[in-house]
A protein has these predicted regions:
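Alpha-helical transmembrane segments and their immediate juxtamembrane cytosolic regions
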Residues: 1-247
Length: 247
């Protein structure tokens, strides 16, 4: 397969798919069973694997892992407010407080487990910890990231992509294994159709197989897109939340 897609192009595909998915939640609240919302949500399943993949790639390419980690957590905090505002369950300022209205799932955005996924990868590759300590820390991170969108599965997928770097088949197998666990929980706890629908993440693998290992051709465009990718997530959620709340 020809390597025709760079990182910027794959990330643009991811945010397009994400936007389609979030518009579907706005237009068709709940677990709508019509063909259009289901197709839109299937398209949306492209996003999380691509995001996880490039969080892991960022670990290997960043010049400063500490700044990279801080940046992810900063945008996780910012995105929490945008995510809560965009939620169909948003009532008032109390909705920004996790667990305030009960429930345990989807208390904050996917940026939270993505940031913890980077920490998980750092732990796995660290020489400071014994294998037992690494295992316990991974379990702890799973607990901390569990109540978010995509739960600890996003963190584990970052770990899978990072520790199997260069072996897309192994990356894909582990990613599908973790998402299958998520799909089972979704199937029994939330909605059967939408549980099965989570497995559409497999559609991201042919796209990742085309990744050429390059960030992009133009340095200025690369710098612009770096911040665009960070800012787009909370900004588009804020806009969708405003449409839902004031519309």
């Amino acid at each position: 397969m020809k390597k025709t897609l760079d990182a910027n192009q794959l990330k643009l595909i991811a945010i397009f798919a994400m936007t389609v998915d979030h518009i579907a939640w706005l237009l068709f609240p709940g677990y709508a069973k019509g063909a259009l919302p289901v197709v839109m949500h299937i398209i949306g399943r492209l996003t999380c694997p691509i995001m996880c993949y490039f969080i892991a790639e960022g670990y290997y390419h960043t010049r400063n892992i500490h700044k990279y980690t801080f940046r992810l957590f900063l945008f996780a905090v910012i995105s929490h407010f945008a995510y809560s505002f965009a939620s169909n369950n948003f009532v008032d300022a109390r909705s920004f407080i996790p667990f305030y209205f009960g429930g345990i799932l989807n208390q904050t955005s996917v940026m939270w487990p993505l940031a913890w996924g980077l920490v998980m990868l750092r732990v796995a590759n660290s020489e400071r910890f014994t294998q037992l300590q690494k295992t316990l820390l991974v379990i702890l991170i799973c607990l901390v990231s569990f109540p978010s969108d995509w739960s600890c599965i996003a963190s584990l997928c970052v770990l899978a992509f990072g520790t199997n770097r260069g072996d897309l088949k192994a990356q894909g197998r582990w990613m599908l294994f973790f998402v299958a666990l998520y799909a089972v929980v979704y199937f029994f706890a939330l909605d059967k159709l939408y549980g099965v629908l989570q497995l559409a993440v497999a559609l991201s693998l042919p796209l990742l197989a085309r990744y050429n290992g390059q960030r992009g051709k133009n340095a200025r465009v690369n710098k612009f897109l770096k911040w665009f990718f960070y800012l787009y997530y909370p900004l588009h959620l804020t806009i969708l939340g405003a449409i839902r709340y004031f519309g």
